[in-house]
A protein has these predicted regions:
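Glycine-rich anion/phosphate-binding loops
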Residues: 1
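Acyl-thioester C-C bond-transforming condensing/cleaving domain
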Residues: 8-18, 30-142
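Acidic helix-start/capping segments at beta-turn-to-alpha-helix junctions
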Residues: 20-28
């Protein structure tokens, strides 16, 4: 939905996307749940055929750009940046450089992150979440 809105706000309609080499560059740093699910199936069943042919696409960082480029028929550059929590910001910076150097006229860019129990548990294990959620006025502290 956000990608569609970005194209609409930039006045890039389907004809523009079809006639120009518009690229896509997204930041995405991990995909935990499909990998954990695959490991569970292999541990229990010892049969990779049970994973199915679509599981690989769920576990790749580039799934976001692959799907969006297909949906919008994008023909320009297509890749994913992985830089932990800064992945989305890096994709915007890389897009700026590509356009500034004349390598692309337009690029859909941004960030996407899988949110699920497993990915949140890893951040919780790092003590990255506040234990004082009842004090929202003190949310930003050194």
């Amino acid at each position: 939905m956000a990608s569609q809105q970005a194209f609409e706000q930039s006045l890039m309609d389907e004809a523009y996307l079809r006639e120009n080499e518009v690229g896509i560059l997204f930041g995405n740093d991990s995909s935990a749940k499909p990998v954990i699910e695959a490991a569970r199936i292999m541990d229990e069943k010892h049969d990779s055929a049970l994973l199915g042919s679509g599981l690989i696409f769920q576990s790749m960082n580039s799934t976001v750009t692959m799907n969006l480029s297909t949906i919008f028929h994008l023909r320009g550059i297509n890749f994913t940046v992985s830089a932990a929590c800064a992945s989305g910001s890096h994709s915007i910076g890389m897009t700026y450089l590509l356009i500034r150097q004349g390598l692309q006229d337009a690029v859909l860019c941004g960030g996407a992150q899988e949110v699920n129990y497993y990915s949140m548990a890893t951040f919780d294990a790092l003590a990255a979440f506040s234990v004082r959620m009842d004090e929202p006025t003190k949310a930003s502290r050194p």
